[in-house]
Amino acid sequence: MDQCDVLVIGGGPAGSTVSSLLSEKGWKVVLLEKDNYPRFHIGESLLPMSLPILDRLGVRDKVEKIGMIKRGAEFVSQYHNGSSATYYFKGARNKNHPY
């Protein structure tokens, strides 16, 4: 492709998503990524509120098979003897997700 309407740099979750959605709308999109995916990277996880967009893109099953489901968050404090607090998404106010 010699020309494009949109050049997206970075094929992580955000870059891949915006590229797919713009392409659906008819834009000529070029996505550039230097790394191979999937790869381990802090912050890449399957958060419950991302499920609707993954469903819309038709990739939820593939992403779930990678195994990055995030069921909650744990906070550890070096200032409190290494104590931690864990919060699970299933205890959140919004119950429209499976975990």
Predicted regions mapped to residue ranges:
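Conserved N-terminal helical subregion
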Residues: M1-Q3, S77-Y99
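A structure-centric signal for secondary-structure junctions around beta-strands
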Residues: Q3, G26, K70-G72
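N-terminal Rossmann-fold NAD(P) dinucleotide-binding loop
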Residues: G15-S16
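Short amphipathic alpha-helical segments, especially helix-boundary/capping motifs
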Residues: E24-L31, P48-M49, S83-K90
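N-terminal FAD cofactor-binding segment of flavoenzymes
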Residues: R39-H80
